Amino acid sequence: MEIINNKKVAVSTSEELKNALENDNGYEFIYLMDNITLDSGIKINENKEKVVIDGTYNGNRYTLTGMSSTDAVDTIVAVSTNKEIIVRNINISYENTYGVIYVPLDLNYIGLLTVYDNINFNGTRLAYNPYGNVKIIDSNIVIEETNGIASLEICVGNYVIIGGKTTITSSSTNSCLFYFRNNLTPSIVFLCQSDVSLSTNTREFMTGTNKLNFTILHDTKVHIITANGLGPNPVYGTNNVLIDERATLIFIQKSHQRVPVWSTYGNFTMKKDSNLELINSYENTPADNYNIHFKGSNCKFILDNPNSVVMYSKNASVLYTNNTLEYKIKCKRINLWNNSKTLTSAGDINDLPEYSWYKDDDLLEINGNIDATTTTITSHNLTEEELNKLPDLNNFIFQSKKQFSLGNNIINVHPIDNSKNKISGHTTDMADVLIKYNNTIEIVKADDDGYFEYNITDAITDNTKIELTSNVASSFIYGSRTITSPYDGELSLIDAVKTFTFSKVPISLDPMIFGKNESISLKIVDSRVNSSEWKVYAYIKNPLTSQGGYTLKNALVFKKLDNEVVILNESPTLIFTGTNNDGNAKMTLITWSKEKGPLLDLTNSALEANEEYF
């Protein structure tokens, strides 16, 4: 044992680890300085409110191996006076099914936090903390049979937090990924700006509750693959679901059982620019294996301007409720299909939705109610002119729909008249573009800049209606434009970065300026016949503010390409001027490096500790 100071110690044997944790010695940080295999259970001293077990010492990372036992007392055991137990920077091999830290099934342990940070774990179960909180950060977790001991869940917990770059896989045939008890209010939260992947090819996501609050915080991607969906029987499900701004959930069911892919008893809410893919990829799924079954009596389905939503099933309705479900949809475009192709050929340019509704220059808003047999619309913002060219709203029916999507592909159509020998434009990179006019139907491919063209032999006469539809294969997302020749082109923002983060390392000390972690770009296409200068402005709706209400005034600045620096506020500020296109359609890619564009100026402000600003 190497004593570092009165709070830190390094250990090299199981006995030394036991002494450091069990005795009232003041040690809060215990470092491994060798690989250790436990040869007895350890009960953490009651006077240690917080303890950290760190597997890295002097630049070397070590492995903790558990005992060959499945008894709760043969692991590291918490007591009720412990508050926070952190295991970090370590490799772990464990066969004990009570996890690395065993927290007893006792209401006295409510709120006890066990943290697994930057660990590589192979074993039967990572965490057992049924009434407490479990946090998993920046880790690789493999749940598998170990030394003949069958594997169970990743963890048993009440409030589970997952974040950072975390990958979790399970080959357990006995247990779901998570177990939550139903006598509290269980939750799972995916932290902001995280990238999390979870998979089981044999079981479901969770079991034990129909009250799970499921939250993905902003700018986070969560990819979940299961054999049989959310839960193993029709009772288990979520309470409220939140997919926050710019967050993404991909949830795939590969097999089936006679329960919905996802059952929910509360509200299902998606915020601005969020994304959802809810896919049942099993082709022979039964008709009652709905993608989402809203089971609560007061559920709401709130889609508040998400970037994209895709739900797919070969045979079952993607949405079902046997109660009255209120829906509120704000989006760029809605697509509904009566029938479904096989997944490998669905959602492409040859699988156009039977029904699509959208507005050309605004967001579509449509609200109403759904029950087991009827979809009703209580309000919408489509004009009479728009309704005349779109499907009848009597076809806006969720019942028996096998495919459903929200989202839009932008299309900039270049000028067309009787002197042109092509139809061209810009859209999403590598999209397929369906072009229809008169008796002509053609599909062309956009290049990696989004440019497409179709060469024609006969001139297009005036007053010809031309329909264009853009789709990236298998995306289920479409964009549509209908124009009449002659057409004089347009100015379009094709693509823009939606989020970025600031570096923690300043690029200037006086003033104290922080750059971005990566460059940002705008893609603008000007195809106007009568082109002129165009301008890009920047402004902020509110100053940077933390969850706790702390504000950074005048902290957001913009460094233009000519190095002029301006403070951003509620008033739009000119940041770029584009030139006219000289008579030819032109794409302009504006890129601001890490050291230009939006920057963070903390010369006259200070960040509060443990606060996130947005």
State each model region's role.
Residues 1-19, 274, 278, 296-299, ...:
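Extracellular/surface-exposed low-complexity segments
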Residues 9-12, 23-39, 50-58:
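Glycine-rich repeat segments that build the extracellular carbohydrate-interaction surface of secreted
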Residues 28, 429-433, 464, 520, ...:
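Short beta-strand/loop motifs in extracellular/secreted proteins, especially
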Residues 37-53, 63-89, 93-110:
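Extracellular beta-strand-rich solenoid/capping regions of secreted or surface-exposed proteins
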Residues 40-42, 67-70, 95-103, 121-131, ...:
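Short glycine/acidic-rich loop motifs that flank beta-strands on beta-rich extracellular proteins
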Residues 52-55, 82-89, 107-117, 134-138, ...:
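All-beta strand scaffolds that present successive hydrophobic residues in beta-strands
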Residues 405-486:
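Ser/Thr-rich low-complexity repeats and stalk/linker segments
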Residues 486-614:
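Signature of Gram-negative chaperone-usher
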